[in-house]
Amino acid sequence: MSFVPTKVFFTKGVGRHKEYLSSFELALREAKIEKCNLVTVSSIFPPQCERISVEEGLKSLSPGEITFAVMARNSTNEHGRLIASSIGVALPADESVYGYLSEHHPYGQTEEQSGEYAEDLAATMLATTLGIEFDPNKDWDEREGIYKMSGKIINSFNITQSAEGQNGLWTTVIACAVLLP
């Protein structure tokens, strides 16, 4: 059986509950993917895969369906602890070439910091496969310009969810790329 996704949507959520597992369930509910049996996969954005809206993607899902996703997930039960989960995306200019999805799930990073880091990871992975020369010690903004000026990377972005832990509760954050046939 061969399955190469043709569509993808991005979603995120946060959940809080006294139980760890229930906080994860609530994050899935906020992301609107709680009805799926999620199977996590690694980080390839398939060639010619179309990005669709969450609403459009949800229409094609059935309760209990085996659903493939790249998921970043983080949890804490520490009051005031900042957590984040990010999916970074880097897409090549040539749609017949695969792109990259990266997962990042830090403690102590803001939503912006986590998102930029995940985006940087994905773009750097793609740049190395495309033979783009760059200095890995340069900051993300400078490398992003090099990647895009090469003409080989057309777009990069991220989806990120962050939250602070609350006293007496588990807090879980997720960010997902849901891959569809």
UniProtKB/Swiss-Prot annotation:
Single GO MF annotation: arginine decarboxylase activity
UniProt keyword GTP-binding present: no
Names of the cofactor(s): pyruvate
Keywords: Decarboxylase, Lyase, Pyruvate
GO biological process: arginine catabolic process
Known EC number: 4.1.1.19
Site residues by UniProt (Cleavage (non-hydrolytic)): 42-43
Entry similarity comment: Belongs to the PdaD family.
Name of protein: Probable pyruvoyl-dependent arginine decarboxylase
Natural source organism: Prosthecochloris aestuarii (strain DSM 271 / SK 413)
Classification lineage: Bacteria, Pseudomonadati, Chlorobiota, Chlorobiia, Chlorobiales
Designated gene of the protein: pdaD
